[in-house]
Amino acid sequence: MSCQQNQQQCQPLPKCPSPKCPPKSSAQCLPPASSCCAPRPGCCGGPSSEGGCCLSHHRCCRSHRCRRQSSNSCDRGSGQQDGASDCGYGSGGCC
């Protein structure tokens, strides 16, 4: 075995690259379902979010009262789903 081949075998192994930090998850807008706030990225998007609510289920409505198909009343705490498609579900029948 030649001298040059021995030198190649004795070279140190390349170091492993340092692990990259995982990307930070963007903060989500998750206030209580009964509170309204200004639309933020990752929460309420689209034209229906203008002046709407940021809800935990990421659905929007224009006012704090649900626009139900049958009536414009808000059944607080009833747990019934809304009739309006642009009003969030799972908020006790209210946005």
Swiss-Prot record:
InterPro entries: LCE. The keyword Phosphoprotein does not apply. A structural component of the cornified envelope of the stratum corneum involved in innate cutaneous host defense. Possesses defensin-like antimicrobial activity against a broad spectrum of Gram-positive and Gram-negative bacteria, both aerobic and anaerobic species. Upon inflammation, may regulate skin barrier repair by shaping cutaneous microbiota composition and immune response to bacterial antigens. Residues 1-29, 68-95 are annotated as: Disordered. Keywords: Antimicrobial, Keratinization. This is Late cornified envelope protein 3B. It comes from the Eukaryota. Belongs to the LCE family. Residues 1-13 have a biased composition (Low complexity). Skin-specific. Expression was readily detected in adult trunk skin, adult arm skin, fetal skin, penal skin, vulva, esophagus and tongue. Not expressed in the cervix, rectum, lung, colon, or placenta. GO terms for biological process: defense response to Gram-negative bacterium; defense response to Gram-positive bacterium; keratinization; killing of cells of another organism.
